[in-house]
Design a protein with these regions (language model features):
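Low-complexity intrinsically disordered segments
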Residues: 99-163
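Residues within HEAT/ARM-like alpha-solenoid scaffolds
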Residues: 50-54, 58, 78, 96-101
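Short, solvent-exposed secondary-structure capping/transition elements
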Residues: 64-79, 92, 96
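N-terminal interaction modules that seed assembly of large macromolecular complexes
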Residues: 29-72
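Short, aromatic- and cysteine-enriched interfacial helices/patches
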Residues: 1-6, 162-163
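Alpha-helical repeat scaffolds in large eukaryotic proteins
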Residues: 38, 60-68, 84, 88, ...
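Amphipathic alpha-helical scaffolding segments
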Residues: 74-86, 140-151
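Short terminal alpha-helical segments
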Residues: 5-46
Length: 163
């Protein structure tokens, strides 16, 4: 969970800035990420689909609980719907089927966070979604996620002193 504990922090500004940075990094590194996923998944799982099922929900899950706790359920649902619209307008528009899988993935991640039974586990989520995990998939996912998240996490932390 994000350690939002200081009253001087603008939660909306910090969260918005963080996701804007992530989105920019995602766009900038899209081809490299796509190449990684081509090697991480079997032929039955298109790489574009894998990105939206794995990387984006993982990034979203980083802030899902604290944002909901601070903003409240109504505001959280509004922000989530806006995010889905933005994802839908990006490189590989998601069909209703993919949106449902995205939401299911997010639900699985939240359950693991809430009951403390699991942190983000790519292979477990892949199996829950009926896909076949490949060797090194989790490591590749983790490294790609870290590549995108860490620089912006650092910038947001320096600006808003989250820690």
């Amino acid at each position: 969970m994000w350690p939002f504990g200081k009253s001087s922090i603008s939660i909306v500004a910090a969260t918005t800035e963080f996701y804007v940075g992530i989105s920019a990094a995602f766009e900038k590194n899209y081809e490299a990420i796509l190449a990684t996923f081509h090697t991480a998944y079997d032929e039955n799982c298109p790489a574009d689909e894998a990105i939206y099922m794995e990387l984006m929900p993982a990034v979203w899950a980083l802030g899902i609980e604290p944002v909901q706790n601070i903003w409240g359920e109504h505001e959280f649902k509004r922000v989530r719907s806006e995010m889905l619209v933005k994802i839908n307008q990006s490189h590989a528009p998601m069909t209703e089927f993919l949106v449902e899988r995205f939401l299911r993935h997010t639900q699985l991640l939240r359950e693991g966070i809430r009951n403390g039974s699991a942190t983000y586990n790519a292979d477990h989520i892949i199996k829950q979604l009926g896909l076949a995990p490949q060797p090194m998939t989790s490591i590749k996912l983790a490294s790609q996620l870290a590549m995108l998240v860490l620089p912006y996490w650092k910038e947001v932390d320096q600006k808003y002193r989250l820690f």
